[in-house]
Design a protein with these regions (language model features):
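Short, solvent-exposed secondary-structure boundary motifs
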Residues: 5-12, 49-57, 137-143
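Surface-exposed cap/loop segments at beta↔alpha junctions
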Residues: 37-121, 127
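Intrinsically disordered, low-complexity segments enriched in small/polar residues
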Residues: 14, 22, 53, 113, ...
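Hydrophobic, Leu/Ile/Phe/Ala-enriched alpha-helical segments that form helix-helix packing faces
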Residues: 1, 102-110, 138-145, 149
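Short amphipathic beta-strand and strand-loop transition segments with alternating hydrophobic
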Residues: 9-22, 62-67, 151-155
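Juxtamembrane "anchor/assembly" segments of surface/extracellular structural proteins
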Residues: 1-44, 77-83
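Short beta-strand-centered interaction patches in the first periplasmic/extracellular domains
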Residues: 57, 64-83, 118-184
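Surface-exposed charge patches in extracellular/virion surface proteins
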Residues: 8, 36-40, 48, 113, ...
């Protein structure tokens, strides 16, 4: 199903709002469609919404839907929020490890691929006690490495998900721009 306000027969949307959060560049997207359109049946929790906006790819999971006889309003979260669905346990490194080695330990399914890695020269020993979500642990690893992370969605030409890239930047300081700098 395609949402396209310029195409007469496509399902049109309105009241759409995209929020971008600095930490990890997570996103939420809310939009409304007509419940009378035949494709409105696909606006359900668990389905995906993919689009390109200002040259950036977005791939979001619909997590909440409100329906009445006239409209369907959906809220979708970016896939970085998907990393909150899996937990990891306590972990202690046996020796100093690179950022990438920690990511492999905490994301063995390779949900994300590391792109830019400005801390690739560092090796650190650390211990985590207790359980945490994969997303929380990745932010914790970034903190240990004095780094900031962002997640970048990459779509195929048909708008299916190609991959999620995690870029790692040195933490913002007088000498480093961190995530906040546009890196087009």
């Amino acid at each position: 199903t395609f949402l396209d306000n310029t195409h007469r027969n496509s399902m049109h949307y309105w009241n759409d709002e995209l929020h971008e959060y600095l930490q990890g560049t997570a996103n939420t997207y809310t939009f409304t469609v007509s419940s009378k359109h035949e494709d409105a049946v696909y606006t359900v929790e668990g389905n995906k919404v993919a689009f390109v906006y200002n040259g950036k790819d977005y791939y979001l999971n619909i997590v909440h839907v409100e329906k009445d006889e006239f409209t369907v309003t959906a809220t979708a979260w970016s896939l970085s929020f998907e990393l909150i669905n899996e937990n990891v346990g306590a972990y202690k490194s046996e020796s100093a490890m690179s950022f990438e080695e920690y990511v492999t330990a905490f994301d063995p399914e390779r949900t994300v691929r590391i792109g830019i890695n400005e801390v690739s020269d560092k090796r650190i020993s650390n211990e985590w006690t207790g359980e945490a979500t994969v997303l929380s642990r990745l932010f914790s690893v970034a903190n240990v490495f004095d780094a900031e992370i962002e997640f970048q969605t990459v779509l195929n030409d048909d708008y299916s998900l190609k991959e999620i890239v995690m870029n790692v930047y040195r933490e913002h300081s007088d000498n480093n721009t961190g995530v906040g700098e546009f890196r087009g």
